[in-house]
Design a protein with these regions (language model features):
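Small-residue-enriched flexible segments
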Residues: 1-108, 118-144
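Proline-centered loop/turn at the N-terminus of a beta-strand
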Residues: 112-114
Length: 144
């Protein structure tokens, strides 16, 4: 179960979020062909087997850092919380790649800021302004 399932997003949000809303495949039944995902799926819904892409991950992390910086302006955060999917951690990328992503975020948001990071399985964050449970993503909150 290395491949996330991608549910197609509406065109109105693809510029900010990409083409797919990713979900982890929790289990599969080889006899029936059924899979379990942590979301509601309508009977006729189409989803895609996707592949994780490090370059897209880098772009998303950079965009996230710049969004936070844009929201807080010239203010220095007092504390940053980072919730990183464990499926993106050592399972998918090497430790030096993870360190490079973190360094990029620190340089963008603030390198002298206390930073609390957590590996999670199911991150809660907005998608088109509505809080959603995500898989294979990074969610951050900056207190300033």
């Amino acid at each position: 179960m290395q491949f996330p399932l991608g549910f197609k997003l509406p065109d109105s949000v693809t510029e900010d979020y990409g083409q797919f809303f990713l979900r982890a495949m929790m289990s599969k039944d080889d006899q029936t062909g059924a899979v379990t995902v942590p979301t509601e799926v309508s009977q006729d819904e189409i989803f895609y087997m996707t592949r994780r892409d490090y370059a897209l991950m880098v772009n998303g992390i950079n965009r996230l850092g710049h969004q936070i910086k844009q929201q807080i302006g010239d203010k220095q955060p007092k504390l940053v919380f980072q919730f990183e999917c464990c499926g993106r951690g050592k399972v998918f990328i090497r430790e030096e790649q993870q360190s490079a992503l973190l360094k990029s975020l620190h340089e963008t948001v603030g390198s002298d800021v206390p930073w609390l990071g957590f590996f999670t399985y199911g991150e809660i964050g907005p998608l088109a302004g509505i809080n959603q449970v995500h898989n294979y993503t990074c969610v951050m909150a900056a207190i300033y």
